[in-house]
Amino acid sequence: DAGIISGVMSFAGPEFNLNDAQTGWVVSSPSFAAMIAMLVSGKLSDRIGRKKILIVVAFLYAFSALASAYSYSYETLYIARMIGGLAFGAALILAPTYIAEISNSQNRGTLVSIQQLNIVLGFFAAFLSNYYFNNLNSTSQIFSDEIVWRWMLGVEFIPAIIYFILMFF
């Protein structure tokens, strides 16, 4: 989401008539939510279990992607991005811990490193996705200026639902 939003705001901002302050809040809202999630997710996962919380996190990611894509106002976009921020913050804390707990000592470092690498690859994929949708925007009715930003946000649903499904294995 953090990578996607850079391409989204040039379309969503004008659609919702956002001023600079509102644009700033939409862009930064996941960071605030992530801080809150980071503060509580460790203790919560100690009580409930990391895997259970990570399943909820995956669901929140998927929900946030769809809610962002279908936002009809500044407020709904802001709330949807806050939900995504909660998921992101919890995942940053819990995923490496969970991986370390379930992996054997010979593979632990490699597996946690791969998880961190996947975060960076996700940012790269987001930028490529924005580029792709912007290029489609100029050649396709389906990706017009009015809805291309919705596709940019909605495409996040794909990795989120894969994450959700794989958490059950």
Regions found by a protein language model. Name each.
Residues 1-169:
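Transmembrane-helix signature of 12-pass secondary carriers
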